[in-house]
């Protein structure tokens, strides 16, 4: 079973299942291992959820026209690209010298109650405190680094599935 030969629907369903699995693991780590997500982690979860939504919509719709598949591929790529940007920022915060760290500021719940959405987004992306802590590693990579790997892989998968030439199922 070569996933590169699967139908568009099956390929996008696989993308959705990957995102759902990653989100489920993030929730497991939070609830059972006790690691509280920082604001950048939460934004990465939102990006994975958006990516999962586009993968699921594409899988359910399963457009026959190449243009429709390309639209889903591009939308998924954009969601993954946003996630890559957030993960890259998080990795940068984690690898910079500790003496350059500043306060992360108040929790995300407080920010969302006292600021508009764009100001919250800007504040979170400039904050660095808790976001700089590395509490979890697997094969030497922190969770934001793994998020980056997954965002890149899923972005490429979305483009492959969306732009792959497909044989017509209509026989002449």
Swiss-Prot record:
Its main location: membrane. Residues 29-46, 89-145 are periplasmic. The keyword Ribonucleoprotein does not apply. Disulfide bonds join 38-41, 104-131. It is found in: Cell inner membrane. GO terms for biological process: protein folding. Pfam families: DsbB (PF02600). Residues 1-11, 64-70, 165-172 are cytoplasmic. The chain crosses the membrane at residues 12-28, 47-63, 71-88, 146-164. GO terms for molecular function: electron transfer activity; protein-disulfide reductase activity. GO terms for cellular component: plasma membrane. It is a multi-pass membrane protein. The keyword rRNA-binding does not apply. It comes from the Bacteria. InterPro entries: DiS_bond_form_DsbB/BdbC, Disulphide_bond_form_DsbB, DsbB, DsbB-like_sf. Keywords: Cell inner membrane, Cell membrane, Chaperone, Disulfide bond, Electron transport, Membrane, Oxidoreductase, Redox-active center, Transmembrane, Transmembrane helix, Transport. Required for disulfide bond formation in some periplasmic proteins. Acts by oxidizing the DsbA protein. Belongs to the DsbB family. This is Disulfide bond formation protein B. It comes from Xanthomonas euvesicatoria pv. vesicatoria (strain 85-10). The gene is dsbB.
